[in-house]
């Protein structure tokens, strides 16, 4: 059986639908690389943008949807939507049987393993698939991007970490007085 076969488990969840969750604030080249790779493994990939009211975000939910759609519009099997609450509940609500997680440095593994085990206790029918980050992007984080954008006006610097279509929006947000 290949990953993109239309297998449905006993719980009614489809293993041809996968969900990649994150804050995507902002979306990075590392995120895009995981999206592209996961879209080849599954018939449908839903990019779930988590909304956490307690966390200060650079981009609002609608802007994050638009940015992720912009960089993934070449992938016909990718959908983008927001969710709040537990990711595992969101995955089940879509009838998906797989959560995709990107792993950056080895330090990510401990946290992701803990989350995977908790998700398994909450819903044993949902599998987690880990995709290792490309070494070019393994060190990229939102904090790093914001620091580079704040300290350098050179868009070529930013383009090493974020898709070029994101740069104008990132620059505008960081230039706004409220940020």
Curated annotation (Swiss-Prot):
Transmembrane in keyword set: no
Task: Tell me the gene name.
Answer: coaD
Family assignment from sequence similarity: Belongs to the bacterial CoaD family.
Spell out the protein name for this chain.
Phosphopantetheine adenylyltransferase
Q: In which pathway does it act?
A: Cofactor biosynthesis; coenzyme A biosynthesis; CoA from (R)-pantothenate: step 4/5
Cofactor names from the entry are:
Mg(2+)
Q: Which GO terms describe its cellular component?
A: cytoplasm
Cell compartment(s), UniProt = Cytoplasm
Listed binding positions for ATP are 23-24, 31, 102-104, 112, 137-143
Function, please?
Reversibly transfers an adenylyl group from ATP to 4'-phosphopantetheine, yielding dephospho-CoA (dPCoA) and pyrophosphate.
The record's section on PANTHER family has: PHOSPHOPANTETHEINE ADENYLYLTRANSFERASE
| Residues engaged in binding substrate | 23, 55, 87, 101
Q: Which UniProt keywords apply?
A: ATP-binding, Coenzyme A biosynthesis, Cytoplasm, Magnesium, Nucleotide-binding, Nucleotidyltransferase, Transferase
Q: Where is this site: Transition state stabilizer?
A: 31
Please report the organism this UniProt entry assigns to the protein: Rhodopirellula baltica (strain DSM 10527 / NCIMB 13988 / SH1)
